[in-house]
């Protein structure tokens, strides 16, 4: 999110010729999740319906042989004298059979997106285009650009009619490096699409946004990756191709000044979009650590309690098979068992050692406790 009050305006020679106020739409909250969701749904509206033929995979008079032949009950092609006879048919697991759940032309191809969601996604994409880090993260070559957003004087863009002059302008403002990236990125598509009239894939270049009727689209339409859009009809599919924020945008001065009337401000509704005002950020400063550690908040917060943690004595674990006290804690019946053993030994005339007698006394003392 940018906080600059003004943006410089450059001419065809890349010299500063003025400045223009930064529109509020470029300071709106950036919602990549919403942009991705809206782009995914809007992109589905350009699909063409397709489907499998109604009788594909079922144009044979196959019938099941039934049970008792030790073969599957799938329908089988009749006849003899050919490899095809006796083969399974119709099923999606069979060669030459129909697919499971054949595609139908009455599938729900289009998606409806709420108007406010679409507008929020557009303003988020515009705000992201004013953050150089997001523009560079998307892959655009803007190292030589003087300022982002880049605003060009009207007379330098609106009068363009030839592609040669447009290329010269892009070179003057150091934006042609992004076009070179597009030219170098052309490669053959992976997959079957290369045989379906979409053989090559290329990256996206800069987007030139103008206002009113101009001839600049004729001059720019033959430059790879460069697209032209009208500020009154901005499309999310162009502002965030692939649902990715940070498109490099070249504005004309008139289009840049028209953003406030097109999308409105934080205090004033839009003049073109009925009843629409820009979404406000929930917090003015997104640096939460800085806010929490500020003097104002720390003065109102109680000091944290210092808890002295005293060291605890280590727990002594005794083996109950060797330590009689530990065994008695686990099994009180061990007392009577030990007494019975001692009495049994004495009755048989076996001399009981003093150690066993001491143990017996210890057992009795523990039991009496």
From Swiss-Prot:
One of its GO terms (biological process) is translation. Keywords: Acetylation, Ribonucleoprotein, Ribosomal protein. One of its GO terms (molecular function) is structural constituent of ribosome. Pfam families: Ribos_L4_asso_C (PF14374), Ribosomal_L4 (PF00573). InterPro entries: Ribos_uL4_C_dom (IPR025755), Ribosomal_uL4 (IPR002136), Ribosomal_uL4_dom_sf (IPR023574), Ribosomal_uL4_euk/arc_CS (IPR013000), Ribosomal_uL4_euk/arch (IPR045240). The modification N-acetylthreonine is found at residue 2. One of its GO terms (cellular component) is extracellular matrix. PANTHER family: 60S RIBOSOMAL PROTEIN L4 (PTHR19431). Belongs to the universal ribosomal protein uL4 family. This is Large ribosomal subunit protein uL4. It comes from Dictyostelium discoideum (Social amoeba). The gene is rpl4.
């Amino acid at each position: 999110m940018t906080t600059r009050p003004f943006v410089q305006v450059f001419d065809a020679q890349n010299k500063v010729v003025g400045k223009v106020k930064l529109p509020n739409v470029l300071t709106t909250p950036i919602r990549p999740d919403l942009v991705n969701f809206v782009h995914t749904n809007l992109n589905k509206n350009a699909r063409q319906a397709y489907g499998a033929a109604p009788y594909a995979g079922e144009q044979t008079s196959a019938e099941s042989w039934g049970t008792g032949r030790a073969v599957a009950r799938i329908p089988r092609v009749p006849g003899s004298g050919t490899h095809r006879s006796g083969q399974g048919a119709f099923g999606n697991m069979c060669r030459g059979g129909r697919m499971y759940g054949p595609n139908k032309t009455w599938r729900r191809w289009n998606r409806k997106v709420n108007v406010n969601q679409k507008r929020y996604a557009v303003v988020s994409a515009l705000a992201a285009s004013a953050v150089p880090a997001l523009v560079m993260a998307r892959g655009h070559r803007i190292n030589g650009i003087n300022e982002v957003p880049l605003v060009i004087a009207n007379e330098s863009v609106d009068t363009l009619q030839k592609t040669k002059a447009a290329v010269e302008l892009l070179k003057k403002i150091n934006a042609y490096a992004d076009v070179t990236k597009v030219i170098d990125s052309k490669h053959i598509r992976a997959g079957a699409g290369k045989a379906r009239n979409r053989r090559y894939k290329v990256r996206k270049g800069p987007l030139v946004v103008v206002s009113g009727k101009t001839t600049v689209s004729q001059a720019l339409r033959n430059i790879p990756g460069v697209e032209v859009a009208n500020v009154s009809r901005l499309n999310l599919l162009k502002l965030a191709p692939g649902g990715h924020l940070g498109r490099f945008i070249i504005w004309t001065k008139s289009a840049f000044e028209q953003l406030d009337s097109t999308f409105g401000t934080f205090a004033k509704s839009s003049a073109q979009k009925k009843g629409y005002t820009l979404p406000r950020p929930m917090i003015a400063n997104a640096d939460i650590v800085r806010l929490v550690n500020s003097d104002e908040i720390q003065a109102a917060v109680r000091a944290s309690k210092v808890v002295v943690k005293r060291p605890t004595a280590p727990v002594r674990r005794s083996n109950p098979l060797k330590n009689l006290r530990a065994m008695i804690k686990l099994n009180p019946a061990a007392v009577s068992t030990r007494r019975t053993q001692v009495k049994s030994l004495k009755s048989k005339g076996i001399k009981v050692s003093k150690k066993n007698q001491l143990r017996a006394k210890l057992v009795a003392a523990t039991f009496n406790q």
